[in-house]
Amino acid sequence: AERLCGGGAGLAGTGSARATWLVDMPAGDAVRLSCAMMQQSDLGSHHLHFAPKRVTIGVGCARNCPPEELTELVRTALNEAGVCDAAVHSINTISLKADEPAILELAQHLNVPLRLFSAKELEAEASRLATPSDVVFAEVGCHGVSEGAALAQLGSEGKLWLQKRKTANATVALGLTDRPLTDLRGAARGRLSVVGIGPGQ
């Protein structure tokens, strides 16, 4: 409301230098705007937090991995990196896991898109992996699922930020890019629609 009434805003936070779309905003003390990927607390009623979506999450898991195991692993990784949920752009994995309940629940939990990549697309990232695995290659056709998926969503401008972390049944890796991500690479999960059923349909 203060801003709509003509009050100026002050920028702060580690991402403020990249927030070039805000340079024309009138400066002032009516509103404080923090631009950072880290969680902000005790902001007050005149303090807004904007988290640029610069982080991609790559995940992999065993078939029928307990959803809570994957979610807890991802939460631990985000806390380790100091990233708030709002800075997450997407969940990414191999196409073989399109129907994996733990991954579907994770995307719903974080309220971000789930994107799928073929083994060939993930193998294209092999040279950038921190922990390539011949065992994984023998099983699914690429040398890394979580790291490869995080990188595949970023494209060539991004980098691996947090290399693979794992539990007994799940893996996670984080990717990072300098600029907020606005597009989605990879494929969305397919849907089946029944158009008609019965005699004459």
Question: Where do the protein language model's features map onto the residues?
Answer:
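N-terminal glycine-rich phosphate/adenylate-binding segment common to multiple enzyme folds
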Residues: A1-D24, A130-G186
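Conserved mixed alpha/beta catalytic, RNA-binding, or beta-rich assembly cores of soluble enzyme
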Residues: A1-K97, G175, L181
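Residue-level preference for the first positions of well-ordered beta-strands
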Residues: T56, K159, R191-V194
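Predominant activation on well-ordered alpha-helical scaffold segments within soluble catalytic domains
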Residues: T71, R75, L104, V145-A149
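Glycine-rich, flexible N-terminal cofactor/catalytic loop recognition
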Residues: L78-V83, A188-Q201
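Hydrophobic/aromatic beta-strand patches that form the interior of the parallel beta-sheet core
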Residues: N92, R115, S193-V195
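Long, charge-dense
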Residues: I94, P101-V145
